């Protein structure tokens, strides 16, 4: 029993900046900071009633817990206790975690009602447990990974996927050490609607082709590639065609984009209706954009004149805010062709899923 409770301790925790006590608790959330040289791990039990739990490990290694925790213990007698937890969102930051501890924790969380998991600034070490025929981990809606390194390198996504139930809807991977996935090992993500690969400046268009394993994302609707080393809209289009994904929304903001003169034509996803090209340094409207869009964001670029209608796709909501040719940041104009220019389109203007609003919110249109 002590070993199982020790494993539960690993599940329920993270941090705010160095509070006097390891854990702070309010009605819904609990935050623990274990950066002290001799942390009081037992204080994490204060988080048992919280829905939103955060753990900050202070960069320490949890290798020693392998001798104290049975990651394969029978959880039968604790099932009702785990199910009764209010835990919905869990964040774990700044630690060195053996894969046996991580996947053992996911097995326990599989009994809970956890919906969102965030792992940040982690190093996952060692050999993982044998693969399972059926996932026993949590039924997550959202998984956020930022600066997480894995001992299994390119096989890490396939390995992690074995421990998650197949209902994942939103996956965010930032500052990844490898996005060159072993696609033959990756299973299909049958419910994934939003994939965010932002803040991976080394990814580039070639890397995007490797990351978007063909036929593994059949329900993908929204792809975010902010600050991801993209160079041309046409190059991204080619990567999407190779992956055979049918997007509705694409965010290419905060990349240094250029117009690829003479680039071969590309067939954009037929359902694409929202394209964000803000903060990309564009001096003119790039050629080869989709012929028709509901929303096109060209704000905060280097356009020195108002684009003429024949330079633009057929678009319902066009944002040009923050470009040099404007006298002010707020500008709207109706073209004879029916193009409407708006200073700052709201997220409600995008006819995408609620998942997009959940993950990207106002970041899709800056």
UniProtKB/Swiss-Prot annotation:
<dbReference type="GO" id="GO:0045087">
    <property type="term" value="P:innate immune response"/>
</dbReference>
<feature type="repeat" description="LRR 9">
    <location>
        <begin position="273"/>
        <end position="293"/>
    </location>
</feature>
<feature type="region of interest" description="Required for response to bacterial lipopolysaccharide (LPS)">
    <location>
        <begin position="284"/>
        <end position="366"/>
    </location>
</feature>
<keyword id="KW-0391">Immunity</keyword>
<dbReference type="InterPro" id="IPR016337">
    <property type="entry name" value="Monocyte_diff_Ag_CD14"/>
</dbReference>
<dbReference type="GO" id="GO:0005794">
    <property type="term" value="C:Golgi apparatus"/>
</dbReference>
<dbReference type="GO" id="GO:0071727">
    <property type="term" value="P:cellular response to triacyl bacterial lipopeptide"/>
</dbReference>
<dbReference type="GO" id="GO:0045121">
    <property type="term" value="C:membrane raft"/>
</dbReference>
<keyword id="KW-0732">Signal</keyword>
<dbReference type="GO" id="GO:0032729">
    <property type="term" value="P:positive regulation of type II interferon production"/>
</dbReference>
<dbReference type="GO" id="GO:0031666">
    <property type="term" value="P:positive regulation of lipopolysaccharide-mediated signaling pathway"/>
</dbReference>
<keyword id="KW-0325">Glycoprotein</keyword>
<feature type="propeptide" description="Removed in mature form">
    <location>
        <begin position="337"/>
        <end position="366"/>
    </location>
</feature>
<feature type="glycosylation site" description="N-linked (GlcNAc...) asparagine">
    <location>
        <position position="317"/>
    </location>
</feature>
<feature type="glycosylation site" description="N-linked (GlcNAc...) asparagine">
    <location>
        <position position="180"/>
    </location>
</feature>
<keyword id="KW-0399">Innate immunity</keyword>
<dbReference type="GO" id="GO:0070891">
    <property type="term" value="F:lipoteichoic acid binding"/>
</dbReference>
<dbReference type="GO" id="GO:0002237">
    <property type="term" value="P:response to molecule of bacterial origin"/>
</dbReference>
<feature type="disulfide bond">
    <location>
        <begin position="237"/>
        <end position="266"/>
    </location>
</feature>
<feature type="repeat" description="LRR 1">
    <location>
        <begin position="50"/>
        <end position="78"/>
    </location>
</feature>
<keyword id="KW-0336">GPI-anchor</keyword>
<feature type="disulfide bond">
    <location>
        <begin position="23"/>
        <end position="32"/>
    </location>
</feature>
<feature type="repeat" description="LRR 6">
    <location>
        <begin position="193"/>
        <end position="220"/>
    </location>
</feature>
<feature type="repeat" description="LRR 3">
    <location>
        <begin position="115"/>
        <end position="140"/>
    </location>
</feature>
<dbReference type="GO" id="GO:0006898">
    <property type="term" value="P:receptor-mediated endocytosis"/>
</dbReference>
<comment type="function">
    <text>Coreceptor for bacterial lipopolysaccharide. In concert with LBP, binds to monomeric lipopolysaccharide and delivers it to the LY96/TLR4 complex, thereby mediating the innate immune response to bacterial lipopolysaccharide (LPS). Acts via MyD88, TIRAP and TRAF6, leading to NF-kappa-B activation, cytokine secretion and the inflammatory response.</text>
</comment>
<keyword id="KW-1015">Disulfide bond</keyword>
<keyword id="KW-0333">Golgi apparatus</keyword>
<feature type="disulfide bond">
    <location>
        <begin position="30"/>
        <end position="47"/>
    </location>
</feature>
<dbReference type="GO" id="GO:0032757">
    <property type="term" value="P:positive regulation of interleukin-8 production"/>
</dbReference>
<dbReference type="GO" id="GO:0140104">
    <property type="term" value="F:molecular carrier activity"/>
</dbReference>
<keyword id="KW-0395">Inflammatory response</keyword>
<keyword id="KW-0677">Repeat</keyword>
<feature type="lipid moiety-binding region" description="GPI-anchor amidated asparagine">
    <location>
        <position position="336"/>
    </location>
</feature>
<dbReference type="GO" id="GO:0071222">
    <property type="term" value="P:cellular response to lipopolysaccharide"/>
</dbReference>
<dbReference type="InterPro" id="IPR032675">
    <property type="entry name" value="LRR_dom_sf"/>
</dbReference>
<feature type="glycosylation site" description="N-linked (GlcNAc...) asparagine">
    <location>
        <position position="147"/>
    </location>
</feature>
<dbReference type="GO" id="GO:0034612">
    <property type="term" value="P:response to tumor necrosis factor"/>
</dbReference>
<dbReference type="GO" id="GO:0001875">
    <property type="term" value="F:lipopolysaccharide immune receptor activity"/>
</dbReference>
<dbReference type="GO" id="GO:0034142">
    <property type="term" value="P:toll-like receptor 4 signaling pathway"/>
</dbReference>
<dbReference type="GO" id="GO:0071726">
    <property type="term" value="P:cellular response to diacyl bacterial lipopeptide"/>
</dbReference>
<feature type="repeat" description="LRR 5">
    <location>
        <begin position="169"/>
        <end position="192"/>
    </location>
</feature>
């Amino acid at each position: 029993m002590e070993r199982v409770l020790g494993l539960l301790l690993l599940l329920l925790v993270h941090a705010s900046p160095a509070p006097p006590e390891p854990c702070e608790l309010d009605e819904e959330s609990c935050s623990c900071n274990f950066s002290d040289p001799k942390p009081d791990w037992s204080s994490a039990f204060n988080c048992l009633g919280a829905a939103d739990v955060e753990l900050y490990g202070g960069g320490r290694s949890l290798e020693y817990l392998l001798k104290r925790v049975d990651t394969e213990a029978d959880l039968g007698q604790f099932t009702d206790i785990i199910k009764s937890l209010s835990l919905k969102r869990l964040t774990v930051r700044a630690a060195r975690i053996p894969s046996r501890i991580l996947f053992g924790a996911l097995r326990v969380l599989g009994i809970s009602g956890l919906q969102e998991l965030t792992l940040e600034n982690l190093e996952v070490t060692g050999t993982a447990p044998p693969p399972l025929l059926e996932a026993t981990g949590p039924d997550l809606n959202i998984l956020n990974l930022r600066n997480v390194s894995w001992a299994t390198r390119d096989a890490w996504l396939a390995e992690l996927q074995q421990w998650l139930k197949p209902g994942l809807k939103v996956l965010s991977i930032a500052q990844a050490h490898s996005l060159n996935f072993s696609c033959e090992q990756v299973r299909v993500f049958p419910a994934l609607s939003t994939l965010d690969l932002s803040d991976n400046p080394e990814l580039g268009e070639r890397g995007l082709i490797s990351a978007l394993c063909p036929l593994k994302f059949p329900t993908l609707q929204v792809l975010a590639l902010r600050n991801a080393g993209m160079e041309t809209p046409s190059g991204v289009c080619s990567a999407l065609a190779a992956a055979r994904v049918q997007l509705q929304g694409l965010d290419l903001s905060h990349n240094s984009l250029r117009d690829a003169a003479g680039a071969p034509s590309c067939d954009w996803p037929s359902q694409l209706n929202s394209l964000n090209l803000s903060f990309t340094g564009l001096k003119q409207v790039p050629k080869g954009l989709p012929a028709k869009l509901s929303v096109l964001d060209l704000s905060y670029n280097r356009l020195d004149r108002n684009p003429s209608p024949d330079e633009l796709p057929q678009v319902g909501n066009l944002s040009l805010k923050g470009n040099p040719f404007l006298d002010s940041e707020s500008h709207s104009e109706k073209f004879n062709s029916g193009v409407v220019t708006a200073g700052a389109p709201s997220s409600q203007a995008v006819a995408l899923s609620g998942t997009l609003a959940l993950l990207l919110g106002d970041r899709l249109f800056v």
